[in-house]
């Protein structure tokens, strides 16, 4: 990257925008129901599902990425293991055919329709893990090469992530950015016995905990979603950059400070940045699953 590229993402947006993101999410901007219908009619493609899709995401705050990365709602079982929730599978009519779709309306009373279409971009729509009725346990599992020393010391590849291992989440730091914002891990979801890996990132954070418990200046709609989709301060998302599909990371490199904030999620491919503590709605065209 040339020195001129640094001018694209001014440094003064760093700490200020991070603080702004901590205290508030945003609402879906500028596209109403009529617009969504128009998009749907103009982008029909062969295959199952797809089209205009609203998803909750961590906010894209800098760089060329067009939108945030979609959240994965999570639950914690009785033993502390973290599970990504998969929507209910149903049959729908599409183009005269009956196809299966994983979709849950009014997810946990949040008013949100949670759908597998949130993840149908960057080729993920063709992954085995996006098969609606795939038999899998849905646990979030540690990946092969974690970026964090604590995770390397705790897990082998394929081990299920456990909330009890994130016990330093109020103080953890690794020299990048501010300590005490949360304790992270990387992993996979719905990817066992598959040639394609769905990468995920998890952070257990006192900031998310505060937002779920009524703190912070966010909308009621945003808070309901955070309460429904996070657990014990832990948040997860599909870790596929919405620009060119690379795998970003939180507190994995000092380069994040140059292009926005060391407290943001940074994609090393083209310097897109995401604020994991600013939860927003996005609208995009989900790609259809292959027939």
Please report, for each region that a protein language model flagged, where it lies by residue.
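N-terminal intrinsically disordered, acidic low-complexity segments at the extreme N-terminus
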Residues: 1-2
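N-terminal secretory signal peptides and thylakoid transit peptides that target proteins
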Residues: 5-29
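Short alpha-helical basic/polar micro-motif
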Residues: 16, 239, 265
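Eukaryotic short linear interaction motifs
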Residues: 28, 211, 244-245, 274-276
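N-terminal pre-ligand scaffold of iron-sulfur
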Residues: 35, 39-240, 244-252, 291
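Short linker/helix segments within small regulatory modules
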Residues: 253-262
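A detector for short metal-coordination/catalytic motifs
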Residues: 263-264, 269-291
């Amino acid at each position: 990257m040339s020195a001129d590229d640094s001018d694209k993402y001014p440094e003064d947006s760093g700490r200020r925008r991070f603080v702004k993101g901590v205290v508030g999410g945003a609402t879906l901007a500028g596209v109403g129901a009529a617009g969504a219908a128009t998009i749907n009619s103009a982008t029909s493609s062969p295959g199952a599902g797809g089209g205009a899709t609203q998803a909750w995401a961590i906010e894209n705050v800098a760089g060329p990425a067009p939108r945030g990365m979609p959240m994965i709602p999570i639950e914690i079982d009785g033993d502390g293991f973290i599970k990504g929730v998969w929507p209910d599978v149903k049959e729908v009519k599409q183009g005269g055919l009956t196809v299966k779709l994983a979709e849950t309306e009014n997810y946990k009373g949040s008013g949100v329709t949670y759908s597998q279409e949130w993840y149908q971009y960057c080729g993920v729509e063709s992954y085995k893990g996006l098969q609606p009725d795939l038999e899998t346990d849905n646990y979030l599992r540690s990946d092969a090469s974690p970026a964090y020393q604590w995770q390397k010391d705790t897990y082998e590849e394929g081990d299920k992530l456990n909330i009890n291992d994130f016990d330093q989440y109020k103080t953890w730091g690794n020299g990048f950015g501010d300590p005490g914002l949360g304790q992270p891990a990387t992993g996979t979801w719905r990817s066992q016995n598959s040639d394609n890996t769905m990468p995920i990132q998890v952070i257990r954070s006192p900031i998310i905990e505060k937002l779920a418990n009524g703190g912070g200046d966010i909308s009621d709609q945003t808070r309901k979603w955070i309460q429904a989709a996070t657990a014990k301060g832990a948040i997860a998302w599909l870790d596929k950059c919405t620009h060119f599909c690379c795998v970003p990371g939180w507190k994995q490199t000092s380069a994040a400070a140059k292009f926005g904030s060391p407290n943001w999620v940074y994609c090393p491919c083209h310097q897109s940045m995401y604020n994991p503590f600013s939860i927003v709605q996005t609208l995009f065209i989900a790609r259809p699953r292959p027939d």
